[in-house]
């Protein structure tokens, strides 16, 4: 049985490092158009992954694009690594650390107990280096130009925030959360609560 991209398919992509979600959609759209010898096809993704994130990206084609909101509304689980003792303006590795914190008092129990405080409904402000739009413009575009923007908080739900490994200053974790959660903000807040 062949794939019918025009009627609609869901494609699961393991997004590579440094690719944007739009890069994946664009490349896939062009490949499908070329393979089927057509000029137009609907292709979209169910949730944005940061360029510096790797992992599952749900791509929908044709009539399946009508279900994108359904898929993007599902809970997500992220696995990552954070460095204790510093933060960056972008909350990730896109920018260099600009704030440093003392870490002598931080131990394994403090990290684990602090992570538990984030489980449940919380208010989170998306980072300025994000795909959130302000007046029709993506925040990351404004941030890269040095434009200061006030970002409103949003309610999100963290279902689990588990610390899987601690090798100071690096901490590995897994986090299961609702739509709209910015993982980089969550671990930046964790680091701030430890100080």
Residue ranges and their predicted role:
Residues 1-191:
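Catalytic/RNA-binding core of pseudouridine synthases
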């Amino acid at each position: 049985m062949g794939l019918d991209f025009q009627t609609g398919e869901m494609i699961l992509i393991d997004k590579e490092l440094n690719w944007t979600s739009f890069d994946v959609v664009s490349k896939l759209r062009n490949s499908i158009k070329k393979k089927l010898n057509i000029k137009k096809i609907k292709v979209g993704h169910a949730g944005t992954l940061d360029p510096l994130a790797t992992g599952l990206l749900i791509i929908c084609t044709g009539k399946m694009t009508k279900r994108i909101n359904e898929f993007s509304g599902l809970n997500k689980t992220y696995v990552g690594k954070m460095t204790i003792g510093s933060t960056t303006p972008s909350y990730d590795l896109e920018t260099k650390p600009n704030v440093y914190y003392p870490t002598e008092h931080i131990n394994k129990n403090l990290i684990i107990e602090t992570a538990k405080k984030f489980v449940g409904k919380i208010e989170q402000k998306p980072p300025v280096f994000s795909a959130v739009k302000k007046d029709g413009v993506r925040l990351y575009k404004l941030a890269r130009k040095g434009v200061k923007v006030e970002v409103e908080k949003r309610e999100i739900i963290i279902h689990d925030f588990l610390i899987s490994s601690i090798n100071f200053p690096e901490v590995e974790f897994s986090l299961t959360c609702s739509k709209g959660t910015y993982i980089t903000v969550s671990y930046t807040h964790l680091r701030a609560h430890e100080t």
